A protein has these predicted regions:
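Basic nucleic-acid-binding interfaces
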Residues: 1-186
């Protein structure tokens, strides 16, 4: 991003994500709310995370996008609600009991030196053969992981052995994210 999102822009994206989920669950239709703000029209990757009762309920995103950020957020919100294969799709009765978190991503940067990975700042994306796995920066912080554990858990997410990141044919990428979310509701 050219600059950090301000509080109003963050609230706007959270509102777009929430409305996209509601429209998607209730009608199956896409939701688009055109925006004029320059930062909301930039092409950035993002992930939208849905939590219910403090537990992960869906998380889908892209590292890069051909769409303006506001459209990408709406699409990833609907995908998180309906297409995360780890969870059943949100239903109408779920619509008053979920919280959102949005991660707006920097471009991926390949790293050869794991000492460059800063827990709490970087997310990790690992590729090896046909396997891929990603963990967002906040995951390591939430679980109080060190760098080694973060790498091992990213390998597990990719379906790889925990030491796969050490292989010569494994590619490790880092990225940062501007992460913001809704207040937790009861």
């Amino acid at each position: 991003m050219e600059r950090e999102l301000n509080a109003h822009e963050k609230q706007t994206l959270l509102a777009i994500a929430r409305q996209a989920i509601i429209v998607g669950v209730q009608s199956g239709q896409e939701y688009v709310e055109p925006r004029e703000e320059k930062t909301l029209n930039q092409r950035n990757g993002c992930f939208v995370t849905i939590k219910q009762n403090g537990q992960l309920r869906g998380c889908i995103g892209n590292f890069q996008s051909e769409l303006p950020l506001f459209k990408e957020v709406a699409q990833m919100a609907q995908a998180s609600a309906a297409k995360d294969p780890r969870f059943y799709p949100l239903k109408e009765e779920d619509l008053d009991n979920f919280n959102l978190e949005i991660s707006v991503l920097s471009p991926l940067q390949k790293t050869e030196d794991i000492d460059e990975i800063e827990v709490g700042k970087h997310g990790i994306y690992i590729e090896k053969s046909f396997y891929r796995g990603v963990l967002l920066p906040q995951v390591a912080t939430e679980h109080k992981w060190d760098r080694q554990t973060f790498l091992k858990q990213t390998c597990i997410k990719a379906g790889l052995p925990t030491d796969a990141w050490e292989a010569d044919d494994a590619d490790i990428y880092v990225f940062s994210a501007q992460v913001f979310g809704e207040e937790i509701t009861k």
